[in-house]
Amino acid sequence: MLAKALATADMLSGGRLTVGIGSGGREEDYRAVGADPKTQTIRDMADRVAVMKRVWAGEKITESVLPVGPAPVQPGGPRLLIGATGPKSTRMAAEWADGLAGITLDLDTGRQNELFDVARAAWAEAGKPKPHLATSFWFALGEADAARAQVHRHLRHYMNWIPPEFVDAMAPTTGWSGSDEELVATLRKFAAIGTSEVHLIPTSSDLDQVRRVADLVGDID
């Protein structure tokens, strides 16, 4: 059913769909659908992706079920990015993924580039084109203390499965906060290490922050 839904989205978007896949770390998400978190590994994910690719190729998965449509617009199916944050999962995904779409908590571009280098080497060893290298981070625009407090509040709300004292301990160094100019400088640092794409995760429902980011990104050379 997921393969069918993704193929349909690819068709409706004219072949512009990119899919992020990850095992996730919130056990309640698995409980909500009756899945066992212990079975959700990168290796199991590879098996599921293999089935989806067979569906997209028009193969019969079982003798009793006809091929499932529609066919995706993109040959072989939509681009798949693995939500990997470590070297082991990155290497294991090289056989089937088209790149990375993880998250950086502390915005350390040196550490991020080390993971990108692992991906570059793994994709080359697998005989595949260079990987798409995406990452993401939470952000808040504004005066330093107010923006950092905004990120902290968001983390407290979002990470409600983690003890509050743990969230409070990680909040000062998790995500990004600062001025418009500082955000542009940060994005340029990620561009310098070959980042293909940065997903900026809002920490406020204030649409003005999203509009400001859109203007800033549009002005980056």
PLM-predicted stretches and their roles:
Residues 1-221:
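Active-site-adjacent structural elements that line small-molecule/cofactor binding pockets in enzymes
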